[in-house]
């Protein structure tokens, strides 16, 4: 990294780094899908360095870099086939191209004085942000992020970040060698993700991140164009004909004279959230303003990414009549009616008042679908035994089921209704009993009668344990707190049931 910083920043010569051994070590240490140099074909740690050295020597020779991944003969190269060779090169190339982006990000954070906070990485921090801001908004744009129609669009997006033409040509080589790229990225995004997870996982995430970065530049334009003048009093009036000529002067004057009456502001009521190939743009603006933003995105995609997007990719919804389904929660803004009784002298009157309140619940069907996919129940939600765990010890089986429920309960603690978690607890509890009964060749009834309530000890939620330790003498307070929505700032990923 220090060697790269000493290079001429106007050129960013990255291609020579592919011939440096330490780059392969960096790719190995920071690879998203683990080691590809050490965990292939039985090579150990010592011989992997020899593979890298021989690989670099062969690349110096003419015509050894041009090898086809789709060659049906799969000619061996250094004891490996060409798929392994291309995978190593793509991982290293993506690592090299990430260097200028990382340096630019670090310098930007240092220049702005942004303090690193691990709590901001928590998924629950998104919901606490929505809870504080979405109740004041009116409309929301639900956007499906379009996929690039051609691989050259991905390369062109990187030209603004990477100035080294040789590195971009090498990237084109890897993209062209990936068979059926166009059909993978346009027809089925899940299939594309599965393909790259097996071959070029890191390269795929790098390209997708750079593409989304260019896609989100359109939001920055909207943010800059949303500045307007707001008046809270008629005490100060500005002649419209001289408005644009007085902007610079007004910026210096309003802080001293008109601070209570006039101010410039960039639409602080426009908020943006991106997740899992989708994005949300919420605003306090009118339906006409949201429709103009929708047209802007269509024109932006068509002119910049050469995409003809169908209208269903962007929908305008009113927050009071719409629910947002993302990250395992169903969030909405509802009107909570309230009535206030007042009295003035001898007259009594009632005041009806509706308060907007952000609410989040956990839909049960996606949870049941995840449990069914992991073979804890069938499609209807009826618990079944985990046959693959029947060979484990009783304590390991109970510990695994208990850990899964504690993780799910911890993640969905922000739900205002706990019925979904009770259903999950029932499914996992009975699935655990069926698994243990299968192991001991007994029935579920006989097994539960034998062990009794001891089977439930592992299914106490982590929240209940924390509350019991925090309020050991006031059980009513702990029970009341356990029924409320709680956001944790230590959750950085969604638990995948298939990995347990």
From Swiss-Prot:
GO molecular function, a single term: RNA binding
Pfam families: Intron_maturas2, MatK_N
Subcellular location(s) per record: Plastid, Chloroplast
Keywords tagged on the record: Chloroplast, mRNA processing, Plastid, RNA-binding, tRNA processing
One term under GO cellular component: chloroplast
GO biological process: mRNA processing; RNA splicing; tRNA processing
Superkingdom as given in the UniProt entry: Eukaryota
Assigned protein family: Belongs to the intron maturase 2 family. MatK subfamily.
PANTHER family: MATURASE K
Function in brief: Usually encoded in the trnK tRNA gene intron. Probably assists in splicing its own and other chloroplast group II introns.
HAMAP family, per the entry: MatK
Full protein name: Maturase K
Biological source species: Helianthus annuus
Encoding gene, per UniProt annotation: matK
């Amino acid at each position: 990294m220090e060697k790269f910083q000493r290079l001429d920043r106007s050129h960013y010569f990255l291609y020579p780094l592919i011939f440096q051994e330490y780059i392969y070590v960096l790719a190995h240490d920071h690879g998203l899908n683990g080691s590809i140099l050490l965990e292939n074909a039985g090579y150990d740690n010592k011989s992997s360095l020899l593979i890298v050295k021989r690989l670099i020597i062969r690349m110096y020779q003419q015509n050894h870099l041009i090898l086809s991944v789709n060659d049906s003969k799969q000619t061996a190269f250094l004891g490996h086939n060409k798929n392994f060779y291309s995978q190593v090169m793509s991982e290293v190339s993506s690592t090299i191209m990430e260097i200028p982006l990382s340096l630019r990000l670090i310098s930007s954070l240092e220049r702005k004085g942004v303090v690193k906070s691990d709590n901001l990485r928590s998924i629950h921090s998104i919901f606490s942000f929505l809870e504080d801001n979405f109740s004041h908004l009116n409309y929301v744009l639900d956007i499906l992020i379009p996929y690039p129609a051609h691989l050259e669009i991905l390369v062109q997006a990187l030209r603004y970040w990477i100035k080294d033409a040789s590195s971009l040509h090498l990237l084109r080589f890897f993209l062209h060698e990936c068979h059926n790229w166009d059909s993978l990225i346009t027809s089925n995004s899940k299939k594309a993700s599965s393909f790259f997870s097996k071959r070029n996982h890191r390269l795929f995430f790098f390209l997708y991140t750079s593409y989304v970065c260019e896609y989100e530049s359109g939001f920055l334009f909207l943010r800059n164009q949303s500045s307007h003048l707001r008046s809270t009093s008629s005490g100060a009036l500005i002649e419209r004909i001289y408005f644009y000529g007085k902007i610079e002067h007004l910026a210096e004057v309003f802080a001293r004279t008109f601070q209570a009456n006039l101010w410039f502001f960039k639409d602080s009521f426009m908020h943006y959230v991106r997740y899992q190939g989708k994005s949300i743009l919420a605003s306090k603006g009118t339906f006409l303003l949201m429709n103009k933003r929708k047209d802007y995105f269509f024109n932006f995609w068509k002119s910049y990414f050469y995409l003809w997007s169908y209208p269903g990719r962007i929908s305008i919804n009113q927050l009071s009549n719409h629910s947002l389904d993302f990250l395992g929660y169903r969030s909405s803004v509802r009107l909570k009616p309230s009535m206030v009784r007042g009295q003035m002298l001898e007259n009594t009157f009632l005041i009806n008042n509706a308060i907007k309140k952000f609410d989040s619940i956990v839909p049960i069907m996606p949870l049941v679908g995840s449990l069914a996919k992991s073979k804890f129940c069938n499609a209807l939600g009826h618990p079944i035994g985990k046959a693959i765990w029947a060979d484990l010890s009783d304590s390991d089986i109970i510990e695994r089921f208990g850990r899964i429920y504690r993780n799910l309960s911890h993640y969905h603690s922000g739900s205002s209704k706990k019925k979904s978690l009770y259903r999950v607890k029932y499914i996992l509890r009975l699935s655990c009993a069926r698994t243990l009964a299968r192991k001991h060749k007994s029935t579920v009834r006989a097994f539960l009668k034998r062990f009794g309530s001891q089977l439930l000890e592992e299914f106490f939620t982590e929240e209940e344990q924390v509350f019991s330790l925090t309020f050991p003498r006031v059980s009513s307070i702990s029970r009341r707190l356990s029924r409320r929505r709680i956001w944790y700032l230590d959750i950085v990923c969604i638990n995948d049931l298939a990995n347990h």
